[in-house]
């Protein structure tokens, strides 16, 4: 392949924003395990290590979404809907950037976004042998999970201290592989350009997740380091000539999650338990936010972002569920699983090692169905939908977890995560109390319907209406003040345990119950899925080889496809 063609491939992320349709090939591939043979056979292209490094270092993780460097001085391109939270954060009643759009004519006019951090993946290392090496045959699934968690915590801490980077172990193939990802974190991020909301989201929710779509869903930020634009030789250059039919295009990004490797019992759990609850929750919340928006003015402006998020998620999960409700698709999955299980049974040695894995996972789904609602309402926070409760829980759990050895903490409170937690808690971000009361009231109503007989819920309500409880909690808390949050951070366990803030008291009240259902989930569901998912992955590797892409995990992946025309109906 000539240099011009490779250069065009490098610009694929940009081209995809504006160009014609690309039919993606199967698989979201790891940067350190690209499908070289497939690319060679189908496109006569083999990505070199230098090519992969360039694309990886040109790619940016925007929270749970994706972007890319587009200049040598830190300019970054992403979607408007990805940057929407930052744009909303920078807006005021007098300066609604969602309504007017924004353009910085000079770097001095660029707007720094409080609390936003972006990351660039510096390297990947296969650490499967170390992580799985702590497992012992006599261990239960829960004991093996605890051993792996301790080893993961130790490795992440070692590597973070050694490199100065944020290091995270990523679980692939349901526990079949573990890779260490090392990230450079940039916390000085400034808005450069954003179109107004009507252009960026033209067509509204009706056009969302459809093709073709006609809107300008882009925005530009600039990353800074030491108050200077972040210098990088790795960025995607604009391709003014575009692509032609048949050209290979490569997309680099952070797909959230996929379920190609889930078992039939796991898919059935999603179809019958998780997605029906999730869809009902989203539909109710969407209707509520639409009603709240009718107040007009600031209410409509403040609800715009949350409403978009709910509508976006609702449409996505509706699509997932429609696939699971399709008997033809489910029959295909059942036949695939049956064929794999039969292949395992034909080899007594493989069957002895892996044959029971599917039944173990199926049993875990029954347990998950029993605890699902309690897990979502308490550990998932669905019963306390307000940013104040999220803040209070973080303070309470951080205070309780920090005195423990790193490996014994809840995984989200390990040392590697503490800088990000501190930045988030001390950032000055707007909170809209009317909207917080509205959301909390709605969630408390549902909590009381489902779990009104629990002592914790009875104590919380004390004979009051949900709206009165919400108003008392929101009006009484001081957690909207970053100085107060900082004082709790610095005061540690003593300050947080002695707090009379009603939101912190609520977080303490429900924490034992939340931890209990979380522990049951981790020991009886998650650990079982991980152990047996890894066994199924190993069976697949033995029977089919390793030329398989793992499911998406929110980490950086590659996707390939060719530009094709189509007939519009």
Language-model features: where?
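Bacterial N-terminal signal peptides that target proteins for export
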Residues: 2-10
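Bacterial N-terminal signal peptides
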Residues: 10-21
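Terminal presequence/propeptide segments associated with secretion/organelle targeting
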Residues: 20-569
